[in-house]
Amino acid sequence: MVLDELISEFDRGLRSLTGISRMSRPVPVPAEPTVGELTPAERAHAAGLMRVNHVGEVCAQALYQAQKLTARSASSKAMFEEAAREEEDHLAWTAHRLKELDSRPSLLNPLWYAGALAIGVAAGTLGDKVSLGFMAETERQVESHLDGHLSELPATDTASRAIVEQMRVDEVKHGKAATDAGGIELPLPARMLMRAASKVMTRTAYYL
């Protein structure tokens, strides 16, 4: 049973890094069609933002895989599995949009994945309440990060905006579920460290 689970998660990790993601929901589409073409500068900026979002989803896969494998209770395992499934949609959506923008994922994805996997294992070994609290805080920070992207994306890039808006809805749901399941609030130093690490990742992934 444990071996089967490890093989399954290894397969998911490979798919995350190779871009072969399974999409359970279609790519969100804007309510109204895009009016006008993006300028080269707007296209480049949108691609940078969507690359950052794609990296975030690579990290989410690693985090939730590690937290699922280290979770003590069946209910916590199920929660991390459900979140990972929805985040895999996000991974596929952002990869799809990057292709539409004639861009590419981050060249450092293996590094981001490995780091997030280690962090997920560390959080999981501290117990389910801490691990769920880490999930809740992660989702809160991602929600804030997506709000920032919605304010930065060109108004005419309705395709990217539709994806980010649905991602935000899902992240809010994941964070609330983790809190409702008993996740504790992390101490301030831990939250600040998470924000600092996130800034390094987002600034680097925008270009690389």
Swiss-Prot record:
Binding-site positions, Fe cation 2: 87, 139, 171, 174
Species of provenance: Burkholderia ambifaria (strain ATCC BAA-244 / DSM 16087 / CCUG 44356 / LMG 19182 / AMMD) (Burkholderia cepacia (strain AMMD))
Enzyme class: oxidoreductase
Gene Ontology MF term list: 3-demethoxyubiquinol 3-hydroxylase activity; metal ion binding
Cofactor: Fe cation
Cofactor binding summary note: Binds 2 iron ions per subunit.
EC number: 1.14.99.60
Reactions catalysed: a 5-methoxy-2-methyl-3-(all-trans-polyprenyl)benzene-1,4-diol + AH2 + O2 = a 3-demethylubiquinol + A + H2O
Metabolic or biological pathway, per its Swiss-Prot or TrEMBL entry: Cofactor biosynthesis; ubiquinone biosynthesis
Signal peptide start and end residues: none
Taxonomic path: Bacteria, Pseudomonadati, Pseudomonadota, Betaproteobacteria, Burkholderiales
Gene name of this polypeptide: coq7
Disulfide-bond pairs as recorded: none
Subcellular location: Cell membrane
Gene Ontology CC: one annotated term: plasma membrane
Name of the protein: 3-demethoxyubiquinol 3-hydroxylase
Domain of life the protein comes from: Bacteria
